[in-house]
């Protein structure tokens, strides 16, 4: 069934003097000035506003995914911001999905595990983004209670031409589904890739 079940909040900057700026240009500036948490707070609020507007227009995507910087994941402030924004705009926590990467866990696996458990208790969904690009992915799946597995686009770029990539992505999708996770394959851009995933990979969600 072809339908939109969710969206991802991505930030772009239309600068009045320099025109369109990609995140690769301006995010390092935020990071260098320790403002990534502030930017993330703004994105969370804007996402909730957009969800509220869609609800009023009877447009109902299942959820909106928001990328969370690694160092911010274990901050008490993040939970406060999420609860405040969802309450203010009347958004159910289950409509917010927090996307985290393996780098979020590198320095503090126990802290990340605790934080993710707390988010889940409050009703927020958590997704592991760019799965397969790190060396410890499987150990993270064992400890971190993520609900969604997002497979990195590098595994689908050469599918179906590459039999090796095809075998890998099929196995990873099967792994996620066997763990009762929703599986999303990122970077799907061609009809051939869509058909391959439907016919050979248990029909995961695509992005």
Place the predicted regions along the sequence by residue:
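Short, contiguous acidic/charged loop-to-helix segments that flank catalytic cores in large enzymes
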Residues: 30-34, 106, 158-164
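Catalytic core of bacterial c-di-GMP phosphodiesterases, primarily the EAL and HD-GYP domains
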Residues: 3-8, 35-111, 187
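A short, well-structured catalytic beta-strand-centered motif of the EAL phosphodiesterase domain
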Residues: 1-28, 47, 149
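Residues at alpha-helix caps and immediate loop-helix transition turns in enzyme cores, especially N-
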Residues: 22, 77-79, 111-112, 137, ...
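Flexible loop/coil segments at beta-strand boundaries within sensory signal-transduction domains
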Residues: 1, 16-18, 57, 118, ...
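Conserved long alpha-helical elements within nucleotide-processing catalytic cores of c-di-GMP signaling
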Residues: 24-28, 37, 117, 157
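The catalytic core of metal-dependent phosphodiesterases that act on cyclic dinucleotides
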Residues: 6, 83-159, 173-207
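Conserved acetyl-CoA-binding loop-helix of GNAT-fold acetyltransferases
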Residues: 39-42, 165-171
């Amino acid at each position: 069934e072809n339908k939109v079940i969710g969206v991802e909040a991505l930030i772009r900057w239309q600068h009045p003097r320099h025109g369109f700026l990609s995140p690769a240009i301006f995010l390092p500036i935020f990071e260098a000035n320790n403002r990534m948490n502030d930017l993330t707070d703004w994105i969370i609020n804007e996402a909730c506003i957009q969800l509220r507007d869609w609800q009023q227009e009877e447009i109902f995507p299942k959820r909106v995914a928001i990328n969370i910087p690694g160092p911010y994941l274990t901050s008490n402030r993040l939970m406060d911001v999420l609860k405040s924004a969802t309450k203010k705009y009347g958004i159910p926590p289950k409509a917010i999905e927090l996307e985290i990467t393996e780098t979020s866990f590198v320095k503090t696996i126990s802290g990340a595990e605790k934080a993710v458990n707390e988010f889940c208790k409050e009703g927020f969904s958590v997704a592991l983004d760019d799965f397969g690009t790190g060396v410890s992915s499987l150990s993270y799946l064992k400890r971190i209670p993520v609900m969604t597995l997002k497979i990195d686009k590098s595994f689908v770029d050469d599918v179906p031409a590459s039999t090796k990539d095809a075998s890998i992505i099929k196995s990873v999708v099967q792994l996620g589904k066997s763990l009762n996770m929703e599986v999303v394959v990122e970077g799907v851009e061609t009809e051939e890739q869509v058909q391959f995933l439907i016919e050979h990979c248990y029909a995961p969600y695509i992005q």
